[in-house]
Amino acid sequence: QRQMCIRDSFDDYIMSPNESLILIQTDTKPIYRHSFTANYYIFNVKNNKMEPLSTGGPQQVPLFSPDGNQIAFVRNNNIYLVKLLFNNSESQITTDGKYNEVLNGIPDWVYEEEFGFNRAFDFSADSKMIAYIRFDESKVPMYSFPLYKGKSPSLDQYATYPGEYEYKYPMPGIDNSKVSVHTFDIKSKVTRKIDLPLDEDGYIPRIKFTLSLIHI
């Protein structure tokens, strides 16, 4: 039987693996080329009910676990986990995320721009672990540029005086973010750092578990 979403409009959606749930994306606010925040709602196809993914603030890059029983997402540079079989209980996986210093599970500006992705974490195939990239951009200098009223969209707050936008931007020869890979065991809640055959200034352009669960 066809079910109707009870929300009048939305920006995008994500289906659960068995298509019994739909994540409804609303109130989308762009950050950079690929990244954005949004408010997500979990729509149950069977009972036609919808509830917020989280009430703690806008979310980024939500991802269903392969078994469809969990959703991980990023908020304020930290990774969170919602367990759908336990009344959508929410727990925080990382705690050191901080604006302009540390990003967990989402890339910095350079990675997003050059490698073209906005999510830096993944579930294992058995849904028991999460692997993620941690970006330490605390040593990357700030870069600023002026903001004017302009058009499409019009920034009316800068109609008389220009504003200024600052973000972390490494010029040639300046340090990039320091990157590392970590795993989180959902049952034991143990986080481990993975030793990688990577130079200090090396890149990690993607993160993905293999189906065998042996490699990342």
What do these predicted regions represent?
Residues P17-N18, P66-D67, A125-D126, L211:
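Residue-level detector of Asp-centered blade-edge/turn motifs that repeat once per structural unit
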Residues D27-Y32, F36-N39, I93-F121, M129-K187, ...:
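Predominantly five- to eight-bladed beta-propeller fold
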Residues R2-I6:
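Short, small-residue-biased leader/transition segments that mark boundaries at the very start
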Residues R7, G56-Q60, G97-N100, L198-G202:
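Short coil/turn segments at the loop-to-beta-strand junctions that recur within blades
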Residues I22, G68-I71, I130, L213-I214:
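Hydrophobic beta-strand positions that form the internal "hydrophobic ladder"
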Residues S9, P58, F117, S177, ...:
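Beta-rich catalytic cores
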